[in-house]
Amino acid sequence: MPIAERRTLLYNPPLSQHEAKTNMSINLFGRVIEDNDQTRARREHLERIQALVGNAYPNKFSRTSLTGSAEGEDTITSVVRAFEKHAPELKEGERPTPEQLEAANAELSRYVVRVSGRLATPPRVMGKAAFVHLSDGRERLQIYVRRQEAVAISNDSDQSVEETESGWKLFQLLDHGDFIGVEGAVFITKTGELSVHVSTIQFLSKALQPMPDKLHGINDPEIRQRQRYADLIASSLKVETGDEPQTEGTERELSTREVFVRRSKLITAMRRHLDEHGYIEVETPMLSPIASGAAARPFKTHHNALDIDLYLRIAPELYLKRLLVGGFERVYELNRNFRNEGISARHNPEFTMLEFYTAYKDVNWMMDFCEEMLRETVQAVHGSLQLQFDGEVIDFSWVERLSMKEAIIRHQSPAWSMLDSEYFEGDWIEDPR
């Protein structure tokens, strides 16, 4: 049995009617490869590629390090941002003059790069030349192959380079979504696009499933939420048409990848602020014999070796307070909690929560500290304390303080007018500022 077919059977187990209805994980993640014309064509391409290159799933690909990127090697993004400054400045629809091309390529021809990425577009074979765009999820870079020129196939990133014209054959077997690595000189095409003139190509991995629609992405919110890997692929491949609706005064919608990156920056900024103010990060038990720390229904499990029931924690509060008793004056934990309750687009049964405790301080000090952390985090993530959301500008340079009573009365519905009565008296806090 061919390798591709064996892999298909492993990824595509038969489902019973009961499994299809009840087992969401199997239904969503088990049947990865559907049997249709497109997947059969991709499996056929994989078998032909294996016959051509031998190992169709190599362990590594060595990239150059000319651009001084944070990764320490050249990525698609670092190459585009390092060399696009050499491209002529053109208006929309305008092409560079021969003089502009000659000047730009005289400078760029000195640079030979090795980069790798996913095919962001289907290969375009135009007579004796072919083009395709590689993507690393952030930027795209066009690569160019000429049929008359020998394109070497690299079977290994460091050695065993076969100097033949088989590279052209390999290029014709590539599908949208495949991963490849290429080596070649950087240049500007006649249309003014930064490209790599390929001299060596290495096949890295085959995409056995067709890629999402590059114009519309994935519109089903259920699929986007449950299959984030597919959503990430779709958002990185999506083409901006200029027709996307955008409300005046609002920022464009972030891509899925940008949301991941901003969340990472947010977590890093919060940790940095706490660390710089003397807090110690700790990890407290996820499994507890008693569900405590909040009024919520817990997830229950059983420890076989100890033969006891345990609960996934709903909050780390009690364990953090024990550390205060033990002598730590400032502790925090940024970790997962689990609450076996409702689920919606805004509420997940498992979620990340920051909880921290400080000895010898009162509520006013804590409010000051939280405001400072909020401002530093927004500045680190957004680059400004003012940002646009839902048509309005939110200014984090100052945060209004309200008592619980004031907040409820200000935002209550008419049916809750009784709250502003003798039955709801007293302020919880006073703003000393």
Segments predicted by a language model, with ranges:
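Basic polycationic patches enriched in arginine
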Residues: 6-7
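Class II aminoacyl-tRNA synthetase catalytic cores and aaRS-like
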Residues: 11-12, 16-433
